[in-house]
């Protein structure tokens, strides 16, 4: 049951919830380039205190495709926040205008606070370095759509697994399924202990690797996030490490024929651009599916069963 629910953490949603969302997203794909009146008269407020391109635009397009209206802001600049207004007061004002609120914020816990203040449902569009539940739902939807199932797949997660909020939410979402996870990163950029412990407690099999070459032949999915330069004190060490976590044509020679490569975008140089034209590249499809997935999410939240 999705009606009236907040979407704050990936941990709040079951396997059954996800399948219901995926089936609705598949249905919504036929309307992703048109306009319907499913949510005519409804208003979505976007409160993006942190920059975003794909998440904000896909939510806005999704609401407009459903026949609803959008208000809000893509930056705190020019809003009352600059005058010192608290997050809680900003949310209270948006709550008075809208039927659903989508928030992105640099501080972890901001979406939870918004949900406590607002009477309307609140959707977390990314807060702090930990939560990005709708991106994870999109990622797993892409996997489900490509393979027809999620159970039984070997999923590799590569790059800065500690500081990418997409990784935390993705691991927690995949924990609903019978998958094997391969964490591929420098040791000091392994995922947070609480994320690993959560998945392990749910029975997920996993292993840790510093070299992608040793496991690429086993993978069905390779999910890539960038190595963040700002995490390194030594620029030379960054360059050395970064080069070890790139997806190249040479690497994929040893991959399964059906391997798919995903990336939450934007990418820097962690995926060779020549891979874009190969059957492995699914990251642009993944981004495009953000609209029907979020159409389904908004529709389920705002529509009584």
Swiss-Prot record:
<feature type="binding site">
    <location>
        <position position="266"/>
    </location>
    <ligand>
        <name>carbamoyl phosphate</name>
    </ligand>
</feature>
<feature type="binding site">
    <location>
        <position position="83"/>
    </location>
    <ligand>
        <name>L-aspartate</name>
    </ligand>
</feature>
<dbReference type="InterPro" id="IPR006131">
    <property type="entry name" value="Asp_carbamoyltransf_Asp/Orn-bd"/>
</dbReference>
<dbReference type="InterPro" id="IPR006130">
    <property type="entry name" value="Asp/Orn_carbamoylTrfase"/>
</dbReference>
<dbReference type="Pfam" id="PF02729">
    <property type="entry name" value="OTCace_N"/>
</dbReference>
<dbReference type="GO" id="GO:0016597">
    <property type="term" value="F:amino acid binding"/>
</dbReference>
<feature type="binding site">
    <location>
        <position position="104"/>
    </location>
    <ligand>
        <name>carbamoyl phosphate</name>
    </ligand>
</feature>
<feature type="binding site">
    <location>
        <position position="132"/>
    </location>
    <ligand>
        <name>carbamoyl phosphate</name>
    </ligand>
</feature>
<keyword id="KW-0808">Transferase</keyword>
<comment type="subunit">
    <text>Heterooligomer of catalytic and regulatory chains.</text>
</comment>
<dbReference type="InterPro" id="IPR006132">
    <property type="entry name" value="Asp/Orn_carbamoyltranf_P-bd"/>
</dbReference>
<feature type="binding site">
    <location>
        <position position="54"/>
    </location>
    <ligand>
        <name>carbamoyl phosphate</name>
    </ligand>
</feature>
<comment type="similarity">
    <text>Belongs to the aspartate/ornithine carbamoyltransferase superfamily. ATCase family.</text>
</comment>
<dbReference type="GO" id="GO:0004070">
    <property type="term" value="F:aspartate carbamoyltransferase activity"/>
</dbReference>
<feature type="binding site">
    <location>
        <position position="55"/>
    </location>
    <ligand>
        <name>carbamoyl phosphate</name>
    </ligand>
</feature>
<comment type="function">
    <text>Catalyzes the condensation of carbamoyl phosphate and aspartate to form carbamoyl aspartate and inorganic phosphate, the committed step in the de novo pyrimidine nucleotide biosynthesis pathway.</text>
</comment>
<dbReference type="InterPro" id="IPR036901">
    <property type="entry name" value="Asp/Orn_carbamoylTrfase_sf"/>
</dbReference>
<dbReference type="GO" id="GO:0006207">
    <property type="term" value="P:'de novo' pyrimidine nucleobase biosynthetic process"/>
</dbReference>
<protein>
    <recommendedName>
        <fullName>Aspartate carbamoyltransferase catalytic subunit</fullName>
        <ecNumber>2.1.3.2</ecNumber>
    </recommendedName>
</protein>
<keyword id="KW-0665">Pyrimidine biosynthesis</keyword>
<dbReference type="GO" id="GO:0006520">
    <property type="term" value="P:amino acid metabolic process"/>
</dbReference>
<comment type="pathway">
    <text>Pyrimidine metabolism; UMP biosynthesis via de novo pathway; (S)-dihydroorotate from bicarbonate: step 2/3.</text>
</comment>
<dbReference type="GO" id="GO:0044205">
    <property type="term" value="P:'de novo' UMP biosynthetic process"/>
</dbReference>
<feature type="binding site">
    <location>
        <position position="135"/>
    </location>
    <ligand>
        <name>carbamoyl phosphate</name>
    </ligand>
</feature>
<feature type="binding site">
    <location>
        <position position="226"/>
    </location>
    <ligand>
        <name>L-aspartate</name>
    </ligand>
</feature>
<dbReference type="InterPro" id="IPR002082">
    <property type="entry name" value="Asp_carbamoyltransf"/>
</dbReference>
<dbReference type="Pfam" id="PF00185">
    <property type="entry name" value="OTCace"/>
</dbReference>
<feature type="binding site">
    <location>
        <position position="265"/>
    </location>
    <ligand>
        <name>carbamoyl phosphate</name>
    </ligand>
</feature>
<feature type="binding site">
    <location>
        <position position="165"/>
    </location>
    <ligand>
        <name>L-aspartate</name>
    </ligand>
</feature>
